[in-house]
Amino acid sequence: IDNRIVGYDAKTGQKKWTVQRTAPALTLRLAPGMVIHDKDVLIAQPGGKLMSLILATGAPRWEIEVGVARGATELERVTDMGGTPVVIDDDVCAVSYQGRVGCFDLATGSPRWTREISSEAGVAVDQRFVFVPDDKGAVFAYNRDSGTSAWKNDKLAYRRLSTPVSYGRAVAV
């Protein structure tokens, strides 16, 4: 992984831009999740970073740390983004391994709310909740507007859970 993002013209296949960031010494080597929304591309980067680029030019709009490296050794400081960021209304919601889950302002990257959690699976989001499994197999639901805890289910403890999917009144992992 060279930590490079490349934008191509959809009609011609010609390269339009390249953005490269320095990779941390250790990562989980998760594939970076990307989502295009309107005129931006949102990218989950190694090292627990979430970045918004202007799709036409590759120019950075903002970059934030969702996962903050902590610990005495390189191994303890490993943090990475889990899954693909999810855009809903004016929010982008994301989670990191050894970091946080949260929803951030789509235009500025400013946090609306964050909670400490560790997940490599990713999030599902609906109009009311953000759903995320932690790395111990518990599934959490947070209020999308405030980040307050709605519920927790730990019946799937110590299983490697997938990115949640929500539909109507159900959520599956």
Question: Model-found features: residue ranges?
Answer:
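Short, intrinsically disordered, charge-balanced linker/junction segments flanking boundaries
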Residues: 1, 164-173
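Extracytoplasmic beta-rich repeat domains
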Residues: 15-38, 63-89, 112-127, 149-168
